[in-house]
Amino acid sequence: MSHNMKGQKIRLAKAHKQNTRVPVWVIVKTNRKVVSHPRRRHWRRRSLDVK
């Protein structure tokens, strides 16, 4: 495995971690004003710009 692939794997892992829903405690704390995650990504609809 080259160094390039390792960097790409790290970036993919970061994108995977970022792609989570809003925590329940945030929804409760904000009294449902914050429900959706504006940067949420679906694997089929939006592609990643990973280099």
Curated annotation (Swiss-Prot):
Signal sequence coordinates: none
Keyword field: Ribonucleoprotein, Ribosomal protein
Biological processes annotated in GO: translation
InterPro entries the record matches: Ribosomal_eL39 (IPR000077), Ribosomal_eL39_CS (IPR020083), Ribosomal_eL39_dom_sf (IPR023626)
UniProt GO cellular component terms: ribonucleoprotein complex; ribosome
Gene3D superfamilies cross-referenced by the UniProt entry: Ribosomal protein L39e (1.10.1620.10)
NCBIfam families per record: PRK01242.1
Name this polypeptide is given: Large ribosomal subunit protein eL39
Organism encoding this protein: Methanosarcina barkeri (strain Fusaro / DSM 804)
